[in-house]
């Protein structure tokens, strides 16, 4: 498509005026179509073809002849409107893009056909894994979003619940604790202790009064401030605390006086310990008297009748085996029917008796060995 505007030396509007001045007959003869074509050609809207043979028309006949020649010839002129030109341009662009996409798809298909089957399989697997990964990522994002929403909702509910409870529960707790001090004091009075020392009563009372439960009850009652009953209970507990403090101070003074001793004891505790020790001494003194009364003075160990019979049998056998002189030297004293009188200390007498028995046993063993050898 070539457009030459250099040959149009004169203004088309001035040329149209000259044509009107030459004769009105040409205008009356020309049809509306010819006038439209002339205006469109003069205005040079959109021209398709070459404009080499275009020249200034002399009359309407020359214009009609030139138009007829241009229509019959190869180099014909076509006037296109701007809208039509735009639609054709868009259509040509779409056709070109379609052709490029078709050629690219054909090229890809040909490349896939030319590739190795293992490569195609791997590519398909990669695409499948990519789809699975994208699905997993989207699911994970949804789960995280739901978790954040749930966390925010629970946190808001907890905050709302805590704020709601803080006002009602505090009031109910205050009213409940205001009723507990009397019960706590009754429980303290029911506890009964049996002390060993009189001073332990004070210690146990201080321990009971120092326990945290009654103090907490009294403190709760003080904070509650429910009336005269609470104030009376508080006074009662204050009096007991003051009494326990006084007893505790008195005991400390007594213990400080006995700080020189190894064990700190009060006077009452000392008296109690002395009484217990006296009882123990009396018991110890009574037990030896009972033991000595069972034995006669000057008499030590005496064999039982069964043992005495056994010793008599041994002596009779020895008398048969030994000569008379040897037998008289080794025979037992119990066989004579009387006991030798022992003089001196009881301990010496027992030692002598033991030595005599050991000597007799040795002699008996020697005699038995001799008999076995013979």
Curated annotation (Swiss-Prot):
Q: What is this protein called?
A: Fibrous sheath-interacting protein 1
For bias type Basic and acidic residues, the affected ranges are 12-28, 45-55, 65-77
Name of a matching Pfam family = FSIP1
Q: Region Disordered: which residues?
A: 1-80, 95-120, 225-244
S-S bonds: none
Q: Which domain of life is it from?
A: Eukaryota
Instruction: Give UniProt keywords alphabetically.
Output: Coiled coil
Q: Which family does it belong to?
A: Belongs to the FSIP1 family.
What species was this sequence derived from?
A: Danio rerio
Taking the record's annotation, the residue ranges forming a coiled coil are 262-290
